[in-house]
Amino acid sequence: MFPYVTDYSGFAIRKWMIDNVDVAGFLCLLYLGLVWKGPGVVKSLREKNLINATLLQGVFIMWNLFLSTFSVIGMIVVVPAAIAHISNKGLVPALCERDVNMIYDSPVGFWVGVFALSKIPELFDTVLLVLQGKQPPFLHWYHHTTVLIFSWQSYCEGSSTIFVFVAMNLTVHAVMYFYFAMCASGFKAIMRTIAPVITIMQILQMIVGSAVTMYSAYVLYNPQPDGPQTCDVTKASARMGVVMYLSYLYLFAALFVESYLKPKKRTEKSK
């Protein structure tokens, strides 16, 4: 599948990302400025009727359909390869030994590289939310900024565990962005039933991510005489991954409890 990337090598992209690592920082600063100041600017624009709500909704739908399609195609390539890689090498060697075919070379390497770079245009999600007059919640902008930084670092260093994170993220995003597109298209009542399923998928993703990052950190700080002496992950990346995934796990679990388990407060009309 995708023969045009059979001989692909991502080392040129890796070099560009290493040489321009400051770009990730500048983008995050601009992004946070949008999150904090954007809603106020947009409010004044909406009061002057300078934003076309119908056009904006159409762009929102098409953008989410594009991201869902992108994720599906990437998932079709990366997920089977990740499963085969773990099956052939064993779980521990697959996680701790760098394989360039799972990071930089081959169709899988192509999609891992595209995935790392895709975290930049994904910030457009927030632009659309702000233009709709919404204040992005903490989980939304925290997730976008930290994923961008972590993906950039993991790809540049050739983290041996990156393929796991890519496979999981593409799978969840394939469903999540399709859900957003359908809700915006007028099918919210129908799609509402799968909303808890998506949050559960996200929680499972964070559980696996936490386990993988904690294991790699454990091996790095506690080499085993009868086991792996090290993992091809830097200590900085391992620490960042542990903090990031554990914080995600807490935030998504809290979101699930708040959204689906807590009893809803009744309004005056419903009393």
Swiss-Prot record:
It comes from the Eukaryota. It is found in: Endoplasmic reticulum membrane. Pathway: Lipid metabolism; fatty acid biosynthesis. The keyword Membrane applies. It is a multi-pass membrane protein. Pfam families: ELO. One of its GO terms (biological process) is sphingolipid biosynthetic process. Involved in the synthesis of fatty acids. Elongates C10 fatty acids to C14. This is Fatty acid elongase 2.
